[in-house]
């Protein structure tokens, strides 16, 4: 399963980078394939392990913020092999190369 998620602390002031960095540390420590970009963190794994990582991130953020906003988008294809986090992007890049 692929998950794209964003966790935002509310009520902590304008700068939230340190809190967001802590959640990225949690994701990276999970050992699951992941990527972080300007808006979301993507993570790949089995349903239970992905959701456990997201929960751990939310719980950590809730320790530092009185309110936490969470956005999650899931792509669940149980019959597909792992590695989709990179293959999906590679597929689009290949299509762009062949259309030029």
Question: Whereabouts are the PLM-identified features?
Answer:
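Charge-rich, low-complexity N-terminal segments
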Residues: 1-100
């Amino acid at each position: 399963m692929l998950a794209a998620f964003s966790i935002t602390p509310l009520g902590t002031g304008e700068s939230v980078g340190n809190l967001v960095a802590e959640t990225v540390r949690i994701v990276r420590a999970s050992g699951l394939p992941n990527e972080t970009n300007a808006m979301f963190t993507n993570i790949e794994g089995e349903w239970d392990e992905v959701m456990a990582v997201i929960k751990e991130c939310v719980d950590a953020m809730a320790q530092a913020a009185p309110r936490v906003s969470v956005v999650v988008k899931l792509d669940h294809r149980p019959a597909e092999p792992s590695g989709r986090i990179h293959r999906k992007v590679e597929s689009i890049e290949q299509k762009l190369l062949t259309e030029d």
